[in-house]
């Protein structure tokens, strides 16, 4: 039974009774534990996890400055929803929304609205709901039978899973425009074939999770414009900018994907990706209040004042919001640009190293978004797979995913590196060396064939 020696306050951590016991898993321990000991035991429980800084699978930020960590730690107790109790926190959130509206080129004549969320998944849910409610209102006004069939959402098959969740939760038909070797982002040649009077909207992705590719949102806007000129039911665009919307404005400000395009009505992003904040904080903005139906804005009075709220989640710490504002203040536009340009340079170095092996076909080189994505060439003539390479890199501490592309391209296995703001030049150089060594080790490994009469599976001896 897990218990404590409360009398021995000065006992060494590893001389304590608790250090000789397994940590509780199914039932809470009866007695309290000295905080020093509890801290060390929990810390040790996490000791065999991978290094977050070497995790090239995640988009999420894994480094913040000590001052940012300090201000976030000092504000963890603040409840973001309690805006009457914490009016200055609410003001910082509003300031972040204003800065994003400026970054995404909202027209001064429009009355934009926005909110923080726990991440892009919640933000996507809000954007999807706004499109559905607005479609339903317009459909009823136009005399369309809204019960004749499900409303639909059109998106590339390279979507993030939150969109599938949205469609399941709110009973929407998910119409996927298939990816192909020729179209690794949304296929604008055929996308309008998926649109009809029951379509609530189209999602353009600024940074597809699988490959890092950008949908051509400018062309998509033109197609939607032509459609709306000849149909009663207006179709709108939501931009899923979870990754790209906090990166592209700083490195490619001339690219038109945002509110400069008249049919883009809402944009979401993840502050905990290229907004450079620890998880989790996201943002969503609507270009004008007409695109956020009134029934999705709720008035909360029982926290001590009448405050509108539009988020799905309720109580959560305001520390990430404050961390986002700290970054905006600390870095400014030029600081973000410098960080992101250096991050992109690191991605380009990695893609060059991959290309120089002669073994891989690169799908994304990191020039648009610092995501490097590639597959083995059909004529690579190697006995190992990308899964083997991922395993070998993991032995050196790097977490690098290998996975199949969506559905129609499910037989294509790719590998992806996500370069974040904390991937410094020393880490880029170390990874290039480890990649080269891993490939050499795989090429020189002795292969053990398990069954000569079936397709070859193999392991490596050392």
UniProtKB/Swiss-Prot annotation:
The keyword NAD does not apply. It catalyses: L-glutamate + H(+) = 4-aminobutanoate + CO2. It is an enzyme of class 4 (lyase). The modification N6-(pyridoxal phosphate)lysine is found at residue 273. CDD domains: DOPA_deC_like. One of its GO terms (cellular component) is cytosol. Its cofactor is pyridoxal 5'-phosphate. Its EC number is 4.1.1.15. The keyword Lyase applies. InterPro entries: Glutamate_decarboxylase, PyrdxlP-dep_de-COase, PyrdxlP-dep_Trfase, PyrdxlP-dep_Trfase_major. Keywords: Decarboxylase, Lyase, Pyridoxal phosphate. NCBIfam families: Glu-decarb-GAD. PANTHER family: GLUTAMATE DECARBOXYLASE. Converts internalized glutamate to GABA and increases the internal pH. Involved in glutamate-dependent acid resistance in gastric fluid. Belongs to the group II decarboxylase family. This is Glutamate decarboxylase alpha. It comes from Listeria monocytogenes serovar 1/2a (strain ATCC BAA-679 / EGD-e).
């Amino acid at each position: 039974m897990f218990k404590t020696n409360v009398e021995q306050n000065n006992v060494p951590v590893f001389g304590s009774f608790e250090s000789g016991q397994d940590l509780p898993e199914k039932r809470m321990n009866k007695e309290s534990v000295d905080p020093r000991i509890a801290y060390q035991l929990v810390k040790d429980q996490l000791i065999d996890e991978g290094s977050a800084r070497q995790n090239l699978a995640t988009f999420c930020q894994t480094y913040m400055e000590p001052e940012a960590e300090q201000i976030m730690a000092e504000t963890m107790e603040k409840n973001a929803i309690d805006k009457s109790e914490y009016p200055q926190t609410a003001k910082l959130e509003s300031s972040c929304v204003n800065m994003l509206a400026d970054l995404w080129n909202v027209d001064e004549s429009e009355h934009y609205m926005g909110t923080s969320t726990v991440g892009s998944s919640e933000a996507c849910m809000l954007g999807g709901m706004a499109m559905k409610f607005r479609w339903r209102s317009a459909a009823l006004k136009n005399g369309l039978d809204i019960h004749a069939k499900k409303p639909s959402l059109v998106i590339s098959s390279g979507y993030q899973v939150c969109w599938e969740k949205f469609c399941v939760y709110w009973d929407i038909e998910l119409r996927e425009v298939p990816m192909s070797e020729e179209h690794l982002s949304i296929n604008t040649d055929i996308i309008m074939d998926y649109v009809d009077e029951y379509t609530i909207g189209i999602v353009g992705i600024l940074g597809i999770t699988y490959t890092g590719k950008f949908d051509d949102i400018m062309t998509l806007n033109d197609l939607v414009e032509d459609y709306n000129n000849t149909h009663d039911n207006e179709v709108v665009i939501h931009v899923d900018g979870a990754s790209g919307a906090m990166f592209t404005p700083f490195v490619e400000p001339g690219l038109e994907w945002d509110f400069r395009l008249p049919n883009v009505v809402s944009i979401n992003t993840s502050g905990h990706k290229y907004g450079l904040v620890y998880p989790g904080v996201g943002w969503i903005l609507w270009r004008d209040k007409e695109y956020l139906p009134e029934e999705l804005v709720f008035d909360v009075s029982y926290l001590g004042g009448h405050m509108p709220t539009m988020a799905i989640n309720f109580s959560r710490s305001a520390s990430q919001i404050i961390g986002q504002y700290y970054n905006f203040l600390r870095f400014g536009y030029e600081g973000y640009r410098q960080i992101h340009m250096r991050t992109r340079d690191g991605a380009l170095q990695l893609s060059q190293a991959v290309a120089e092996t002669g073994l891989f076909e690169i799908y994304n080189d990191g020039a648009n978004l610092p995501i490097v994505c590639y597959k083995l060439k059909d004529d690579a003539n190697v006995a190992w797979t990308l899964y083997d390479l991922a395993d070998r890199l993991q032995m050196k501490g790097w977490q690098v995913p290998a996975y199949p592309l969506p559905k129609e391209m499910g037989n294509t296995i790719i590998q992806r590196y996500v370069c974040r703001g904390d991937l410094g030049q020393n880490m880029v150089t170390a990874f290039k060396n480890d990649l080269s060594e891993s490939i050499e080790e795989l090429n020189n490994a002795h292969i053990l064939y398990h069954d000569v009469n079936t397709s070859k599976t193999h392991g490596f001896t050392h």
